[in-house]
UniProtKB/Swiss-Prot annotation:
The active site is at 158 (proton acceptor). It catalyses: D-glucose + NAD(+) = D-glucono-1,5-lactone + NADH + H(+); D-glucose + NADP(+) = D-glucono-1,5-lactone + NADPH + H(+). SUPFAM superfamilies: NAD(P)-binding Rossmann-fold domains (SSF51735). It comes from Bacillus subtilis (strain 168). One of its GO terms (molecular function) is glucose 1-dehydrogenase (NAD+) activity. Substrate binds at residue 145. Induction: Induced at stage III of sporulation. Homotetramer. This is Glucose 1-dehydrogenase.
Length: 261
C-alpha cells in the first residue's frame, strides 16, 4: 500500500470490467477517490463502485465514449465536480478483434485506433490541460501492451494503436516533465480478463500462450493494478516516459530461454 495515494482522485476509463475494474478496486484499497468510466449500458459499473467503496475508497460512475471529445471532457469534469480535483488519469479503455489485414474494413481500423489511441490522447490531453492550468504535478498512465513492440498478425490495428501510444506517451512525458507532470505506459502481456476468457478456456490455446511466457503462467488483473498503483505513487516519483512491461517476460525473446540461438 502507498499512503500518499489516500484521498487522491483518479479517473479510469473502461473501468467496468477487466483491468479497469481491478485498478479501480486497487485504488479503493489505497483509499483513493475513483471516477469509474464505462461505455455500454450492458455493463454494470455500480458493482465496481460498490467494490471500491467496500475496499475503503470513494467512487462515482460516469458513462462515456472515449472517442468523443465531449465525453472525455465530462469524465475529467466529473472528477472535479464530485471530488474537487483530478490527480491521476488512467487511459485504459481498449478494443481488439482479429481480422486478416488485407480484408480489414476501414470501420474496424477506425474503431480500434479511435478507442485505443485517440481515446488515450483525449484523456491525456484533458487531464494535462487541467494539471497545467491548476499547477498540479499530476500523473497520466496509459494502457499499452506487449504489442507495442511485438508484431501481432491479424491485429494490425491493435498493434498500430499500441505502437502509437508508446511514442505519444514518450512525447508527452518529455513535453511536460518540466512542469512535474509524469506520463507513463503499462504494457500488459497475457492477462486473465473477460476479453481473453474464451481463448483461455481452451486448454490447447491456453498452453500455447503459456509457452510464450518465461514465467510460465497467465497474469491476473490484480498484478497489473499493482503496477498502476506503484506508478501513481510517490515511490515512482522519478519515473516518466517509460513502458513498464508486466508480462511474465514475454517481451524477453522466450524462444531463447533454453539457450537456443
Amino acid at each position: 500500500m502507498y499512503p500518499d495515494l489516500k484521498g487522491k482522485v483518479v479517473a479510469i476509463t473502461g473501468a467496468a470490467s477487466g483491468l479497469g475494474k481491478a485498478m479501480a478496486i486497487r485504488f479503493g484499497k489505497e483509499q483513493a477517490k475513483v471516477v469509474i468510466n464505462y461505455y455500454s449500458n450492458k455493463q454494470d459499473p455500480n458493482e465496481v463502485k460498490e467494490e471500491v467503496i467496500k475496499a475503503g475508497g470513494e467512487a462515482v460512475v460516469v458513462q462515456g465514449d472515449v472517442t468523443k471529445e465531449e465525453d472525455v471532457k465530462n469524465i475529467v469534469q466529473t472528477a472535479i465536480k464530485e471530488f474537487g480535483t483530478l490527480d491521476i488519469m488512467i487511459n485504459n479503455a481498449g478494443l481488439e478483434n482479429p481480422v486478416p489485414s488485407h480484408e480489414m474494413p476501414l470501420k474496424d481500423w477506425d474503431k480500434v485506433i479511435g478507442t485505443n489511441l485517440t481515446g488515450a490522447f483525449l484523456g491525456s490531453r484533458e487531464a494535462i490541460k487541467y494539471f497545467v492550468e491548476n499547477d498540479i504535478k499530476g500523473n497520466v498512465i496509459n494502457m499499452s501492451s506487449v504489442h507495442e513492440v511485438i508484431p501481432w498478425p491479424l491485429f494490425v490495428h491493435y498493434a498500430a494503436s499500441k505502437g502509437g501510444i508508446k511514442l505519444m506517451t514518450e512525447t508527452l512525458a518529455l513535453e511536460y516533465a518540466p512542469k512535474g507532470i509524469r506520463v507513463n505506459n503499462i504494457g500488459p502481456g497475457a492477462i486473465n480478463t473477460p476479453i481473453n476468457a474464451e481463448k483461455f478456456a481452451d486448454p490447447k490455446q491456453k498452453a500455447d500462450v503459456e509457452s510464450m511466457i518465461p514465467m510460465g503462467y497467465i497474469g491476473e488483473p490484480e498484478e497489473i493494478a499493482a503496477v498502476a498503483a506503484w506508478l501513481a505513487s510517490k515511490e515512482a516519483s522519478y519515473v516518466t516516459g517509460i513502458t513498464l512491461f508486466a508480462d511474465g517476460g514475454m517481451t524477453q525473446y522466450p524462444s531463447f530461454q533454453a539457450g537456443r540461438g
